[in-house]
Amino acid sequence: MSKITSSQVREHVKELLKYSNETKKRNFLETVELQVGLKNYDPQRDKRFSGSLKLPNCPRPNMSICIFGDAFDVDRAKSCGVDAMSVDDLKKLNKNKKLIKKLSKKYNAFIASEVLIKQVPRLLGPQLSKAGKFPTPVSHNDDLYGKVTDVRSTIKFQLKKVLCLAVAVGNVEMEEDVLVNQILMSVNFFVSLLKKNWQNVGSLVVKSSMGPAFRLY
C-alpha cells in the first residue's frame, strides 16, 4: 500500500515546475531527481539491493552514452549521433585505471555489441561494474536508436554503503501528469525493492537540478 497519494505528489510537482519554468528559469534542461533516505537498514548486514525500471518517458534526453561496437555498430552509432569506440580503441586504453575512470565519468551509460560484451571486463577491468555502468548488450537485429532511448529511459536504484540514493525521474519540460506518473512509478518500484518496504523509507524528496527540495514523505 503506497503511503503517498498522487494528489500529494501533484501539489509538489506544480510548485517544482512553477519554480523552474517561471520563477527561475535556467538556460539548460533541469533534471528532476527523486532523493531517498533509508532507515532501519544496515548496508553491511542487509542485502544491498539493485533494480532497474524503464520509465514511459525519458528523464534525461541529453544523457551521454557511448557504444563499444564492432564495425557494424560503430557505423550505426554514427548515424544515431552517439559516440562509439571500437575494440582497438578500448585496447589503446591499455587497462590504465586513470583512463578507464575518466571514460566512466565522461558518459552516463554504455552499450556494447553482443559479440563484444564478454570482452569488456577483460579490456577494462571491473571499474564500469563498480560504477554501476556495465554496458547494456545490443544485437545486430536490435534497433540501435530504440536501444539508446531504452537506456536513457531506464533508472537504476543501487544501494552502496550510504543510506541515501538519488535518481533522475524526469525533467522540467515534462507535462505535470507525466512527471507525477514517473515519480509515483519510481517510488512504488523502489519501495518494492526494500526488505520491509515502507518501514525502511526515511524520507522521499523531489527536486530539480537548481530548485528547492519538496518533501513527499
UniProtKB/Swiss-Prot annotation:
<dbReference type="InterPro" id="IPR050257">
    <property type="entry name" value="eL8/uL1-like"/>
</dbReference>
<feature type="modified residue" description="N-acetylserine">
    <location>
        <position position="2"/>
    </location>
</feature>
<feature type="modified residue" description="Phosphoserine">
    <location>
        <position position="79"/>
    </location>
</feature>
<dbReference type="InterPro" id="IPR016095">
    <property type="entry name" value="Ribosomal_uL1_3-a/b-sand"/>
</dbReference>
<comment type="function">
    <text>Component of the ribosome, a large ribonucleoprotein complex responsible for the synthesis of proteins in the cell. The small ribosomal subunit (SSU) binds messenger RNAs (mRNAs) and translates the encoded message by selecting cognate aminoacyl-transfer RNA (tRNA) molecules. The large subunit (LSU) contains the ribosomal catalytic site termed the peptidyl transferase center (PTC), which catalyzes the formation of peptide bonds, thereby polymerizing the amino acids delivered by tRNAs into a polypeptide chain.</text>
</comment>
<dbReference type="InterPro" id="IPR028364">
    <property type="entry name" value="Ribosomal_uL1/biogenesis"/>
</dbReference>
<keyword id="KW-0963">Cytoplasm</keyword>
<dbReference type="InterPro" id="IPR023673">
    <property type="entry name" value="Ribosomal_uL1_CS"/>
</dbReference>
<dbReference type="InterPro" id="IPR002143">
    <property type="entry name" value="Ribosomal_uL1"/>
</dbReference>
<dbReference type="GO" id="GO:0002181">
    <property type="term" value="P:cytoplasmic translation"/>
</dbReference>
<dbReference type="InterPro" id="IPR023674">
    <property type="entry name" value="Ribosomal_uL1-like"/>
</dbReference>
<dbReference type="GO" id="GO:0005829">
    <property type="term" value="C:cytosol"/>
</dbReference>
<keyword id="KW-0488">Methylation</keyword>
<feature type="modified residue" description="Phosphoserine">
    <location>
        <position position="86"/>
    </location>
</feature>
<protein>
    <recommendedName>
        <fullName>Large ribosomal subunit protein uL1A</fullName>
    </recommendedName>
</protein>
<dbReference type="GO" id="GO:0022625">
    <property type="term" value="C:cytosolic large ribosomal subunit"/>
</dbReference>
<feature type="modified residue" description="N6-methyllysine; by RKM5">
    <location>
        <position position="47"/>
    </location>
</feature>
<comment type="subunit">
    <text>Component of the large ribosomal subunit (LSU). Mature yeast ribosomes consist of a small (40S) and a large (60S) subunit. The 40S small subunit contains 1 molecule of ribosomal RNA (18S rRNA) and 33 different proteins (encoded by 57 genes). The large 60S subunit contains 3 rRNA molecules (25S, 5.8S and 5S rRNA) and 46 different proteins (encoded by 81 genes). uL1 forms part of the L1 stalk.</text>
</comment>
<keyword id="KW-0689">Ribosomal protein</keyword>
<keyword id="KW-0007">Acetylation</keyword>
<keyword id="KW-0597">Phosphoprotein</keyword>
<dbReference type="GO" id="GO:0000055">
    <property type="term" value="P:ribosomal large subunit export from nucleus"/>
</dbReference>
<dbReference type="GO" id="GO:0003723">
    <property type="term" value="F:RNA binding"/>
</dbReference>
<comment type="similarity">
    <text>Belongs to the universal ribosomal protein uL1 family.</text>
</comment>
<dbReference type="Pfam" id="PF00687">
    <property type="entry name" value="Ribosomal_L1"/>
</dbReference>
<dbReference type="GO" id="GO:0003735">
    <property type="term" value="F:structural constituent of ribosome"/>
</dbReference>
<keyword id="KW-0687">Ribonucleoprotein</keyword>
